[in-house]
Amino acid sequence: TWAMPASGHLDGYPGEGCQAVLMVGATTYLYDVEPGGGAYVYWPSSHHIAHRYFRQYPDRIEGTFRETPEWDERGWGIFSDDGPEPPREFVARAGDLILWHGWLCHSGSTNVNATPRVGFFARWVHEDDAGVRRSIPADPWHHWAI
């Protein structure tokens, strides 16, 4: 049986892939993904929680939040437990795309369906990653432009 992941994570920290403050991520599927089909799962508005956290504790942007008593109690939940909504699956048709803020708490999920979940996943960092780490902007969208 399928179950929603208990917690997500933020990319860009030791043990979580690349070590950089991610600006944007993208997820798209090559096949339709139905509920329980291994979808990308995200915690709505968790990027705002993470932004507030790093504004309050800028010295923890390098991942030292994982060395705190709060981390020992809540793990990645420090970025998602207090959100306004429960996590959601990105259930979508082939070719649909979700662009997500780099501080959005997210996870993969188990595929209990007969159809494979095949997708493309991309992540981008700011060209001045070190500068972004030194100065967390007041607006979480400060470095974004369309």
What are these regions (language model features)?
Residues T1-Y42, H47:
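Conserved double-stranded beta-helix
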Residues L10-Y13, T27-T28, P84-P86, L104-S107:
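Glycine-rich, charged/polar anion/phosphate-binding loops
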Residues Y13-A20, D32-V33, E89-V91, D96, ...:
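A general structural signal for short secondary-structure junctions and capping/turn motifs
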Residues G15-Q19, D32, A50-R55, F65-P69, ...:
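Glycine-rich loops and low-complexity Gly/Arg-rich segments
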Residues A20-Y29, P44, R60-P69, W76-F79, ...:
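Low-complexity, flexible helical/coil segments
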Residues M23-G25, P87, L97, G119:
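Intrinsic-disorder/low-complexity, polar/charged segments enriched in Ser/Thr/Lys/Arg/Asp/Glu/Gln
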Residues V33-C105:
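Double-stranded beta-helix
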Residues R55-R60, A94-L99, W103-I146:
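Non-heme Fe(II)/2-oxoglutarate
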